[in-house]
């Protein structure tokens, strides 16, 4: 807490005297920085965050890297993903230590490895799309390489091994080669093998705890009946730390406002989506000028709100106007509304690129080019389709006559709409 105390002193330099006292309730407190969602933060950006953490009095930074760190003799691991080199990790580790912050490797040794396992070179250790094949010697030789890299580049002995959300464990190549085995037994045996490697390297491991719950209950994450008998459950080594995570369960009242966003159709909601985003845009427009350090971030969200104020319910209005044969409204949409959205979207994309290239390595930004560039192109195509209908080149817009169906039916849990699932009813790989 030295740097937190120093921060308070600096803010009271003009005071003759001041007194402030805090009680520490956690031995360790910090942040997990996700560097596996395509954007790998630059070393300088991580150093900036380390300074912020120090000022806040935190002493742990977990670096979450599924395949975005260098491993000797594994060139496909993290290929074209902007992975941290060994020297970069050592530089971050040394810098963190200067501020009393422990840099903890947070890796994956079972699931969440789809970016690595997609390569044919990695097929020999693949169980299913993103899960390593348990019980196979080549798998543990590979994991040993991962842990040796961790041992050599991080000064801490603590390591987070991941192992969460491996719901298809043992149901891929393992099933075909060895037959069925209970998930609870597979996770225990796999943990034991990885624990042996950790012990040999002097590492103190922890994992996410959900798989021990899921494998024993065969239910959802942390779905355990109140009267469950846990006495016969497969249990982990007592030296293996279990880390609890759960953002699926809470009081339903906390989610009531959010659930409205997943209604069958925006039209079914009483919320004026356009006005909602317009209000956000107005607020952010004021904030953009208030922060020199974070002004660009505010500008991005300002433009995002501007885009959504026009686009969020655009499809609803287009279909309504088409169904009612209100051609003047369609003309207004194609000639004014869509061009305005495109203008805001292009500026939003420019700002997002500037933020990315400032904060992260360039790898991965190409996917935002595809996504946002695709939205821009689709808006232009939509405008042309409407114009062709209005000037008589086509007699109907068949895509607007298709009955609208909800992605999630009423019987299903309504969760996020994923771009790859809702951008089309067709499959990208089947396109001629």
Give the label of every model feature segment.
Residues 1-206, 250, 257, 275:
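Feature activates predominantly on carbohydrate-active enzymes
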Residues 8-17, 51, 91-94, 100-102, ...:
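Substrate-binding groove of N-acetylhexosamine-processing glycoside hydrolases
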């Amino acid at each position: 807490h030295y740097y937190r105390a120093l921060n308070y002193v600096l803010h009271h330099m003009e005071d003759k005297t001041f007194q402030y006292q805090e009680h520490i309730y956690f031995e360790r407190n910090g942040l997990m920085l996700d560097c596996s969602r395509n954007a790998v933060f630059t070393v300088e950006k991580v150093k900036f965050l380390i300074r912020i953490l120090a000022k806040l009095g935190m002493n742990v930074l977990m670096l979450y890297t599924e395949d975005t760190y260098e491993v000797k003799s594994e060139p496909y691991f993290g290929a074209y993903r902007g992975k941290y080199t060994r020297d970069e990790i050592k530089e971050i580790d040394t810098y963190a230590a200067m501020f009393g912050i422990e840099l903890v490797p947070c890796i994956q040794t079972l699931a969440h490895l789809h970016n690595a396992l997609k390569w044919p070179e990695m097929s020999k250790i693949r169980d299913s799309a993103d899960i390593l094949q348990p019980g196979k010697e080549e798998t543990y030789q590979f994991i040993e390489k991962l842990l040796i890299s961790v041992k050599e580049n991080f000064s801490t002995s603590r390591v987070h091994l991941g192992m969460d959300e491996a719901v298809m464990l043992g149901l891929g190549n393992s099933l075909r080669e060895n037959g069925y085995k209970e998930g609870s037994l597979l996770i225990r045996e796999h943990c034991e093998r990885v624990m042996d490697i950790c012990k040999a390297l002097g590492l103190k491991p922890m994992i996410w705890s959900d798989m021990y719950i899921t494998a024993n209950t065969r239910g959802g994450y942390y779905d355990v009946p109140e009267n469950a008998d846990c006495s016969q459950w497969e249990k982990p080594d007592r030296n293996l730390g279990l880390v609890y995570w759960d953002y699926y369960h809470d009081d339903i009242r906390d989610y009531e406002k959010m659930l409205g966003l997943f209604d069958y159709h925006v039209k079914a909601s009483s919320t004026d989506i356009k006005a909602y985003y317009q209000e956000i845009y107005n607020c952010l427009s004021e904030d953009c000028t208030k922060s020199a350090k974070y002004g660009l971030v505010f500008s991005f969200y300002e433009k995002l709100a501007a885009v959504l104020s026009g686009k969020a319910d655009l499809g609803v209005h287009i279909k309504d106007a088409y169904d009612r044969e209100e051609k003047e409204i369609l003309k207004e949409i194609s000639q004014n509304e869509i061009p305005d959205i495109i203008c805001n979207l292009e500026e939003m994309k420019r700002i997002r690129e500037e933020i990315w290239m400032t904060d992260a390595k360039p790898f991965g930004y190409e996917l935002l080019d595809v996504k946002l560039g695709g939205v821009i192109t689709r808006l232009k195509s939509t405008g042309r389709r409407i114009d062709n209908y209005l000037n008589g080149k086509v007699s109907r817009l068949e895509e607007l006559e298709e009955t609208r169906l909800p992605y999630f039916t009423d019987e299903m849990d309504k969760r996020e709409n994923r771009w790859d699932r809702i951008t089309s009813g067709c499959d990208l790989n089947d396109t001629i």
